[in-house]
């Protein structure tokens, strides 16, 4: 039970971080590009975490 709660909290934190990345990308007018890039990364590597995919996509587009 405790592990499940911790996992849910971690997932929520990841989603919050992803949203912050997307908001920052939006400030550059690149939210859609970052989102699409992250989705492509996840298709290419299903073992990649959602957060890591969005971080990589953000870093690729926001240089």
Feature names for model-found ranges:
Residues 2-63:
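C-terminal alpha-helical interaction appendages
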